Every structure is written in structure tokens, then in C-alpha cells.
Amino acid sequence: MTDKLTSLRQYTTVVADTGDIAAMKLYQPQDATTNPSLILNAAQIPEYRKLIDDAVAWAKQQSNDRAQQIVDATDKLAVNIGLEILKLVPGRISTEVDARLSYDTEASIAKAKRLIKLYNDAGISNDRILIKLASTWQGIRAAEQLEKEGINCNLTLLFSFAQARACAEAGVFLISPFVGRILDWYKANTDKKEYAPAEDPGVVSVSEIYQYYKEHGYETVVMGASFRNIGEILELAGCDRLTIAPTLLKELAESEGAIERKLSYTGEVKARPARITESEFLWQHNQDPMAVDKLAEGIRKFAIDQEKLEKMIGDLL
């Protein structure tokens, strides 16, 4: 009897949404994704202490300025954790640009290149790295430029169709539409508190994006993220990739039974619309109160965890 995780792998590339190396060894995902919150959590794991110490020692060699040392050590720690994960996954690691740069295209590009250089200096080629950027207009423009320079990007905190469309038109490598956080918003802001997986608003959003991309021939990878239960995951079987937290990977691995493919596209490829303009993007995104709330909240939360990480690093300098 097969388990649901093995069955899911027939249709979808499974990615681990964690910085926990023990979980990588256990579930053997193709790729892994990290973010400031996951890096902060990983930094509390005793086995990672040597990675922190290395980042701090390295930063001290780069500059005598304490503020710069904190920035350097934080970047180096994210890359050090990524390097450990890359020993265990055959595919790619996603490493996130500082969320406080989400509205600054040039600063985002500079930070992305900095992270890439740290990986390259450690012997990792660009084809094993994805740079994560928030799906703001500025983040999408940064990704468009980085893609032209051979740096593949993962556009995260994606909640609206306008964001998804702009990402595809920018030619970004991959998007991470957030399923569970969409569900959270609808539960908190509407009278409906329970949703069957097929009508879960996060599942519906990702399904619509997947269909739109396939029917217009966009090559941007759709990677569903931020799951609250395995029902959401099973409804998206067939999505290009799904990034899943270890607790849900465990639940899938311990659940018996084959699953059926839910997402696929076999129709003809249609003509693409004209590119969305900045004003159209901002207006359409603004028309979706869930997306407005969740994008802003996500950026704030990642920024808070980035600052906590920097404080932890600062205390060690």
C-alpha cells in the first residue's frame, strides 16, 4: 500500500518548507525553501550553532563597522543554512531578500546579487539557487532584471491574481502563492468558518493561477505554499510544485492510499493579453482586500523576524 506523500510525488515536485536539516534527511524533498522566520527558528537549533559562529567570525573579517557586521553576518547565516540544506536536496534552495527592501527595486537587486555571490564563493552555481522576493511591483521589477542576468527568482507573499499575472509577464522562474494565509483571512473576516478543501479560497486561488498560466503558455513554475492541512495539499495534486512544512509531510507519509491528480491542463495555448501596467497592477491588487492585508502583513512579519535575527547576531558580535 502506497502512502499519500509517495503518491503525491507522481504528480507534483515536493519541496520542504523548513530550515531544519533533520527534516530534510527524513523526507528527502527535491528542493527546500527558507524565509526570515524559518532562519530565525533554525538559528535556535543547537546543531546550527557552528553556522552562526562561522557567520559572525566571517562578518568581523569583512568590516570594522558593527552595523555592517550585523548585515553581513545575517546574510552569511542564511547562506550557511542554505549550504547545509543543499548537501541534502538534489535541487534548489530558496533564500529570501530582506523584507524591508520590498519596495526598493535597486536595493533588492543589490541584496540578491550579494546572496548569490556568497553562494558562488562557496562553490554553488546559480542553477541551484532561487532568490525570494516579495511580490510587490518593485519586487517583480527586481526579479525581471535578475532573471535577465541569469539569477532565478521565487516571488513570494503572492495573494492576488494581479500579482500572479505580473510575475508571469516579467518572466520570473517561480511563484509561491500562499494557500493557508488566504484561508486564514477568510475565516477571520467573513462569517464562513469551515471550508471543504475544494472550496478553500486559497486552493481556488492557486487553481485559477495554474490554469491561467498553462492556458497562456507561461513557463513560470507555480509552487503552492503555506498550507494549513493536508486537504489543501491533496486538492492541489498536479500543481508544478508544493512546498510543505515537516509536520504536514509527516502526516502525508503516515496516511495510506493513492491520491488522484486534481490540476492539469491539456487544452490549446491561447494568446497572451497585453502586459499589465503599474497603475493597472496597483488598482487590481487594491481591489482585493484580502491580498492587500496579507501582503502588507507578510512583509511586516518577515521584517520583524529579520530584526530579531539581527538582534541575536548583534548580541554575539
From Swiss-Prot:
The active site is at K132. It is an enzyme of class 2 (transferase). It catalyses: D-sedoheptulose 7-phosphate + D-glyceraldehyde 3-phosphate = D-erythrose 4-phosphate + beta-D-fructose 6-phosphate. The keyword Transferase applies. Keywords: Cytoplasm, Pentose shunt, Schiff base, Transferase. Transaldolase is important for the balance of metabolites in the pentose-phosphate pathway. This is Transaldolase. It comes from Escherichia coli O104:H4 (strain 2009EL-2071).
